[in-house]
Amino acid sequence: HDLAARVGFNGVAKSSDKLVFGHEFCGKVLDYGPKTRRKLKADTLVCAMPLLNVDPKGYVPTGLSPSASGGYAEQILVQSSLMFEVPNGLDADSAALTEPMAVALHAVRRSRIKKNEPAIVIGCGPVGLGVIIMLKAAGVKTVVASDFSPNRRRLAELCGADVLIDPKQQSPFSSWKELGLLGNVSEAINMGMGIFDKVQTFSLPWVNAMRVGDKL
């Protein structure tokens, strides 16, 4: 982030900046700014894309910029054009998951994975868990989840993961052979992931590698 700020992305937080985190949030409309179309009544439960147009910087990420406080603040500003009403009486706690679940759904759709093709999820944070849920909702039969944290692996199992891998004990990639899910290794590709130097691709129908945020 420091490097990004130095080369001109001024909306990105530096380590010296004071900011309030939280880009996954839900809240109620309190009021509107000047020259803003009042499209929803006060007290309406809403979600919004975590982006805020701050002149002259343009759009900055909510919860990752000192110019746009995130969901842990008592009150936040959201972009009216990127805001929408929470539908169907959904509760606020569930609605706050809209952003990570949308990222997960988008990733699974882009992967075009088929139900009989295995999937591997590296990292079981909010987005990784969302990907597992969306994969199982799409009918994918075998989902392998890998994370260093035992708690996250337990959550992955609750979300529907079929195989849990502790990468301290075994590679999630070499585990494919043991599970009988692999053909022959076709090549190794460099994905630049801090803890993995190489990610192997296999001579199977499934050759989709999707990068979601900082997770595969």
Question: Where does each model-flagged region fall?
Answer:
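Cytochrome P450 core scaffold surrounding the K-helix E-X-X-R motif
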Residues: 1-6
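N-terminal Rossmann-fold NAD(P) dinucleotide-binding loop
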Residues: 128-129
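Adenosine-nucleotide cofactor-binding segment
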Residues: 121-124, 136-216
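Loop/turn positions that initiate beta-strands
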Residues: 42-43, 116, 213
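Glycine-rich beta-strand-centered segment in the early N-terminal region that forms part
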Residues: 7-52, 69, 87-89
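NAD(P)H dinucleotide-binding glycine-rich loop of Rossmann-like/cofactor-binding domains
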Residues: 14, 46-122
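Surface-exposed amphipathic alpha-helices with a cationic face
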Residues: 109, 132-137
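Short, well-ordered loop/turn sites that connect or cap secondary structure elements
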Residues: 39-40, 113, 210
